[in-house]
């Protein structure tokens, strides 16, 4: 040990705070030299602040999984905020999304309906120019909880069970195969209560029927009838309403009220779907619809654009 290290140790104080933060202080306890909350590894405790870039993968303070249940070295998964119009969080394996939270509306993530309950509220997201600061506080001081990214890619909420005197998982991001990002491919919706769990949207067929029948849904579905936007003499496209849905990835946000959201989509021949959600506003999709899931609590109404002939006798859905 060199003289500099001896001086550092002899003039500092280590303190384990009630929050779980291990802090190295100057000997007068006025300045923090180092703290474990700046290096959260695989866990998010109340008071930890994660920092993410809004426009790149330059994430400053992040959650990384362990390599295995017994090996704390950096594993395959990490929590990330990928460049999108709307704020949402991903668990990624390398650079590939594995799970997605859905857009943040200022109170909850649209892809996590259970977050409406008190036991999972308390998240705060602060916007600092091009950086986001994410933290959470206990909404109920009598309910102790923390979050962990497991070595196999699950984001878990852990609650203290007084009767068992132990921690118990009360929620996890991957509860079924439908929670895995894009499991059904493009233009398909995943429903954990159905067999098979993947189903093409109305107006679409499997891109590879043999793979689809064998349970390989990754190629998704393709449109049966081309959209008729700006085709002379053809009828205006219509919209199929899907209720209680996890909205697809790559939402494009525009300034529009609920009444005008559908109009904005119809005016753009590249627009494939739209949705309006309080706190988020008008969302349009101009790329393949991926990672749709059927919810049974909350969720959003998503309107899928189809050729008029795919919905004969049905009026254009109200936006």
Predicted feature locations:
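Beta-rich ligand-binding surfaces for carbohydrates and other polyanions
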Residues: 1-319
């Amino acid at each position: 040990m060199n003289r500099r290290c001896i001086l550092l140790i002899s003039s500092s104080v280590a303190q384990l705070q009630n929050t779980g933060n291990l802090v190295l202080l100057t000997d007068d306890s006025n300045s923090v030299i180092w703290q474990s909350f700046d290096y959260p590894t695989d866990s998010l405790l109340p008071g930890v602040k994660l920092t993410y870039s809004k426009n790149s993968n330059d994430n400053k303070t992040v959650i990384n999984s362990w390599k295995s249940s017994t090996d704390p070295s950096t594993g395959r998964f990490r929590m990330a905020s990928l460049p999108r119009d709307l704020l949402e969080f991903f668990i990624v394996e390398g650079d590939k999304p594995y799970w997605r939270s859905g857009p943040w509306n200022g109170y909850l993530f649209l892809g996590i309906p259970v977050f409406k309950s008190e036991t999972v509220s308390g998240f705060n997201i602060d916007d600092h120019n091009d950086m986001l600061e994410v933290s959470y506080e206990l909404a109920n001081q009598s309910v102790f909880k923390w979050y962990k990214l497991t070595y196999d890619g699950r984001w878990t909420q852990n609650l203290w069970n007084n009767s068992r005197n132990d921690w118990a998982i009360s929620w996890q991001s991957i509860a079924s195969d439908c929670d895995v990002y894009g499991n059904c491919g493009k233009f398909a919706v995943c429903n954990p209560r159905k067999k098979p769990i993947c189903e093409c949207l109305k107006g679409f067929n499997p891109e590879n029927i043999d793979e689809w029948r064998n349970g390989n849904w990754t190629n998704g579905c393709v449109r049966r009838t081309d959209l008729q936007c700006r085709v002379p003499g053809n009828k205006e496209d219509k919209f199929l309403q899907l209720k209680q849905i996890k909205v697809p990835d790559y939402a494009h946000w525009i300034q529009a009220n609920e009444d005008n959201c559908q109009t904005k989509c119809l005016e753009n021949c590249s627009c494939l779907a739209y949705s309006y959600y309080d706190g988020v506003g008008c969302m349009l999709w101009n790329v393949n619809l991926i990672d749709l899931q059927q919810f049974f609590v909350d969720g959003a109404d998503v309107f899928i654009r189809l050729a008029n002939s795919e919905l004969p006798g049905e009026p254009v859905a109200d936006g």
